[in-house]
């Protein structure tokens, strides 16, 4: 997306979208060829610096303006000027009234556009998609966007900008930018967020500065289920954090299956009532699609945006937003309150780009609450340093303690070609008596061999397996939810975000490096989640007792110890 550089009688440099050239007011002096926004902003910086020095000297403004044109022509490699006949200084200035003429007869369309871009950061390609959804020409959307820029409600920013000796993407913050020669000189392209569309130094983003809400709201909040005692305690602390705490961040460390998401609903309702915008974010879209019906159930009548890669409608209206962390990159300082679920999950964990995007989606003085059952070491360090408030939710709703994993050591490796299963047939039969079995393995290559192995030893059982790239994955998991399998073999794709009634868990090769303490806690957290089946069996089968296994078991025991101390669980014999 390119812009025309404009110049007024005072020597002030401005710009106008290239697609809007026909709408330029009469008397505007501009370059004949459009330029990338970054070059125009360099020219603006150049003229502003010269104004502060002796460059201008004395004399008529017309002579000064001619000198600026000459210098800018040299600076921009010989660009030629389109100079109209001028009658007054006002002829050089793009007035708000002239820009507003672009919406004459399109007031309803402009209103729709205005509501859909609040707090957004959008590329030219995304603005064209919005034009298709509003069933209008892209040039009209461009005029609407520039009108907001002229009214200081938004700005155009280069997608990738020079930073020191390198570059930085303005959408995801990435500094590892691919550099290449262009017609306009050296240019940079960000590959980190390319799935959202191109981001180069020759492109520009429309960045809207307005919040999603313009005032207090009447919010209908009707919780479907009352909060438990443990949830009420945590919910009160979340509310106190939002209202009173000077700290900008909090960590809600919850037991698996304790209902941490619902704990945040009362605080979200209060924030909306106060005119604050709220975002529920998560790395994985299946979490978003799981939370969406629960939010819609408890917030009837509240418009909610649900934004994931699989949702066909990209632009929605709503004061309450549910989005994957990738979709959050399309917002800029839009939210007063952000709840991030599963902060330790892929692809957010370890992604500086997604972390940068989430931070920059928060408004100044906004609050960020991380929700997880398995906090990262970095988050725990922030808590210890006093930079992040810690809130604990150690108990599930049924007041049973969390099941503790049992470690069973074996000499033989857990390669499916080994004779291990023949030695443990009775063990698996014993576990099956307690409920259906979910078996976790560390490698995709182990799935089918173990499925075949189990089928050979248990011919009467219904046995299946799946992994991330399995084309039948969703159908198999649907059948698993319906209880159609006696035993199911999986990689870590099922370690979180799924509740299976009466399931028992076995982790084969639990000492494998891919199974860190967070993965092991999450896998153990599949057991005992419902009131009908509040307990169960978790077995870590391994050749050794790894540090991750010890840490995972210690974390689970610590949750039970804290819950018992607070009177949130009952002793069981």
Give residue ranges: language-model regions.
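Post-DEXD/H (motif II) to motif III coupling segment of the RecA-like Helicase ATP-binding lobe
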Residues: 333-410
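Conserved strand-helix element at the start of the C-terminal RecA-like helicase core
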Residues: 251-261, 271-272, 276-291, 427-455
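N-terminal pre-P-loop "Q-motif" helix
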Residues: 223-248
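Conserved helicase motor
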Residues: 282-290, 294-296, 304-316, 323-330, ...
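Conserved segment of the helicase C-terminal RecA-like domain
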Residues: 363-378, 524-555
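Conserved interdomain linker/interface between the two RecA-like ATPase lobes of SF2 helicase motors
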Residues: 387-451, 463
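Conserved RecA-like helicase motor core of SF1/SF2 enzymes
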Residues: 342-346, 481-486, 490-534, 542-547, ...
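Interdomain "pre-motor" coupling segment immediately N-terminal to P-loop NTPase/helicase cores
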Residues: 116, 123, 129-214
């Amino acid at each position: 997306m390119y812009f025309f550089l404009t110049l007024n009688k005072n020597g002030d440099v401005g710009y106008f979208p290239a697609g809007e050239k026909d709408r330029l007011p009469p008397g505007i002096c501009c370059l004949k060829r459009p330029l990338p926004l970054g070059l125009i902003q360099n020219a603006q910086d150049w003229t502003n610096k010269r104004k502060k020095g002796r460059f201008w000297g004395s004399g008529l403004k017309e002579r000064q303006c001619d000198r600026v044109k000459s210098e800018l022509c040299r600076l921009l490699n010989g660009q030629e000027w389109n100079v109209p006949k001028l009658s007054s200084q006002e002829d050089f200035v793009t007035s708000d009234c002239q820009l507003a003429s672009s919406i004459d007869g399109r007031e309803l369309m402009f209103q729709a556009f205005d509501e859909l871009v609040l707090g957004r950061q959008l590329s030219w390609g995304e603005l064209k998609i919005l034009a298709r959804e509003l069933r209008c020409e892209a040039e009209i959307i461009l005029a609407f966007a520039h009108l907001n820029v002229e009214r200081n409600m938004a700005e155009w920013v280069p997608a990738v900008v020079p930073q020191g000796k390198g570059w930085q993407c303005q959408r995801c913050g990435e500094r590892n930018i691919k550099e290449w020669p262009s017609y306009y000189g050296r240019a940079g392209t960000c590959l980190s967020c390319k799935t959202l569309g191109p981001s180069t130094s020759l492109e520009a983003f429309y960045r809207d500065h307005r919040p999603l809400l313009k005032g207090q709201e009447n919010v209908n909040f009707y919780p479907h289920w009352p909060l438990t005692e443990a949830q009420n305690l945590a919910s009160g602390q979340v509310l106190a954090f939002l209202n009173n705490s000077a700290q900008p961040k909090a960590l809600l460390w919850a037991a698996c299956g304790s209902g941490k998401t619902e704990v945040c609903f009362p605080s979200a309702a209060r924030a909306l009532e106060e005119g604050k915008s709220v975002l529920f974010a998560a790395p994985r879209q299946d979490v978003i699609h799981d939370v969406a019906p629960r939010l819609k159930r408890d917030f009837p009548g509240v418009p909610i945006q649900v934004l994931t890669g699989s949702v066909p409608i990209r632009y929605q209206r709503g004061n309450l937003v549910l989005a994957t962390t990738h979709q959050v990159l399309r917002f800029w300082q839009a939210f007063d309150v952000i709840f991030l679920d599963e902060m330790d999950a892929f692809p957010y964990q370890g992604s500086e780009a997604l972390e940068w995007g989430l931070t920059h989606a928060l408004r100044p003085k906004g609050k960020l609450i991380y929700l997880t059952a398995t906090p990262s070491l970095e988050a725990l360090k922030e808590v210890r340093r006093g930079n992040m408030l810690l809130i604990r939710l150690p108990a599930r709703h049924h007041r049973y303690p969390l099941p503790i994993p049992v470690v069973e050591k074996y000499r033989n490796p857990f390669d499916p070609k080994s004779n291990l299963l023949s030695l443990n047939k009775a063990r698996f039969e014993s576990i099956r008596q307690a409920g259906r079995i979910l078996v976790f393995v560390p490698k995709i290559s182990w799935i089918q061999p173990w499925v075949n192995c189990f089928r050979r030893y248990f011919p009467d059982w219904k046995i299946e397996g799946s992994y991330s790239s399995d084309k039948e994955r969703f159908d198999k998991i649907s059948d698993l939810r319906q209880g159609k399998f006696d035993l199911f073999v999986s990689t870590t794709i099922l370690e979180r975000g799924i509740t299976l009634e009466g399931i028992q868990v076995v982790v084969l090769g639990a000492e494998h490096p891919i199974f860190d303490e967070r993965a092991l806690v999450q896998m153990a957290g599949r057991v005992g989640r419902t009131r009908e089946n509040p307990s169960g069996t978790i077995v870590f089968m391994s050749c050794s007792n790894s540090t991750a296994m010890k840490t995972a078991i210690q974390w689970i025991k610590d949750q039970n110890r804290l819950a018992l101390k607070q009177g949130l669980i009952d002793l069981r014999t």
